A protein has these predicted regions:
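Terminal amphipathic alpha-helical/low-complexity segments used for targeting or macromolecular assembly
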Residues: 1-195
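Active-site-adjacent "gating/activation" loops or surface patches in catalytic cores
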Residues: 214-216
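A structural motif detector for beta-strand N-caps
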Residues: 182, 188-189, 197, 202-209, ...
Length: 224
């Protein structure tokens, strides 16, 4: 069973004030969090046996309350087997293919020359500690094979703003959201391509609401 551990490096400080009360990987980009994008890239689902995190100790209790199914700063969990360790500020490329990356010896994946993720056994994973992630990656890159895997970094708060539009489009395409019910079509005004608009069947839309998809997709989520 594949496992994923999301980690925070010293770059979390450069994302303040957004990261004062949340982990870096809980920041939104497009229509999902950075954590969701990383987990999707590696095709790793939720659950306490599959997800872990190494974050600032000041946020540990808050994170456990928000996400009780993730093992937070849990060295025992880290030492139970092989695991993908991913920097929570890394955004995998849209065409990322994780198949064939696992098994065999440990490796480090680089993005723009910086460690973005790694596949390691328990002998390395158990050494992960809060506030020491940079040193852990530096040590690992000196011992195992490293290769470029692409992607991009979220280094500053304004990166989320600058990249948001492109990721809204990317998320819409990856989610393959299509279709409007006749009920919605009969009550809205649409400007632009209909295939760029997704309205969940449970969403309540006031009559004659105008949706303009000329410049990009629009998603109305469940319960809206």
């Amino acid at each position: 069973m594949m496992r994923l551990c999301l980690v925070e490096d010293s770059g979390a400080a450069n994302l303040e004030p957004l990261t004062l009360t949340r982990a870096t990987f809980d920041l939104m980009l497009g229509t999902s969090t950075l954590a969701t994008k990383i987990a999707r890239a590696f095709d790793i689902g939720p659950g306490p046996a599959r997800r872990g995190a190494v974050i600032r100790t000041s946020l540990a209790e808050v994170q456990r309350s928000r996400d009780p199914h993730t093992a937070v700063n849990d060295r025992d969990w880290l030492g139970r087997g092989e695991v993908v360790v991913a920097n929570g500020r890394w955004v995998p490329p849209a065409d990322f293919d994780a198949s064939g990356l696992f098994g065999g010896s440990a490796w480090v994946g680089l993005c723009e020359g910086r460690p973005a993720c790694a596949w390691v056994g328990p002998e390395y994973a158990a050494d992960l500690e809060p506030n020491c992630v940079d040193d852990w990656f530096d040590d690992l890159t000196s011992k195992v094979e490293c290769s470029d895997i692409g992607g991009e970094w979220i280094d500053r708060p304004w990166d989320l703003v600058a990249k948001n539009s492109a990721h809204i489009r990317r998320d819409f395409e990856q989610d393959a959201k299509v279709g409007l019910t006749n009920r919605h079509l009969s009550s809205i005004a649409l400007i632009g391509p209909a295939e760029r608009l997704f309205i969940h069947e449970t969403a309540r839309i006031d009559p004659y609401t105008v949706f303009d998809t000329t410049n990009g997709p629009i998603t109305v989520s469940a319960g809206a």
